[in-house]
Amino acid sequence: MKRSAKQLLWSELFDLEASGLVEVYFGDASGFWQTPVVARAWQFANEEIRIVPKRGGRLAVFGFLSKANVARTWTSKKSIKTRFVVDCIDEWVPERLGKPRVLVLDNAQVNRSRLMQSKREAWEEKNLYVFYLPTYSPHLNLIETLWRQMKYLWLKPEDYISFERLTEAVKKILDGIGSQYKIKFKDRVFI
């Protein structure tokens, strides 16, 4: 089977990371709202579990995650727009990095906008390079695993009682990535 140029670059990227020559981070946004996504629950016989869905606020989260569980995240009560993403990247890389850092992003409109493209040269001067995933490949973006873990495993039903409590729980998890909350990526197959 012939491998595409993108697959070869993807493979080289991880070889460079394994050699310690670059740092690779995966970036993405997700939303958390009061309607829980708990797919199943266990209870004792004759015990009833109730989760009352409520319409409440939505907490938007944008962040970067490495395979070593190093994360940098930002939250907003507004939708994530290009300006927000650019400001986050600028805050994350305020000056030239010693070791090159590759930021892997999906092809969302926010990531492909003119503003994002206009910033790439300045970021590259700081040793930050943006790598876009192939289209329709969200499974390759490791931070998607973080969002799933948060929504399906780490958030508890009682965290959805109020928007304030949900916000607090989400921020607690985000602050604990790498210490209390870890994902094992070493066995993951990428291609």
Located regions from the model:
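Short functional hotspots at interaction and active-site rims
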Residues: 1-191
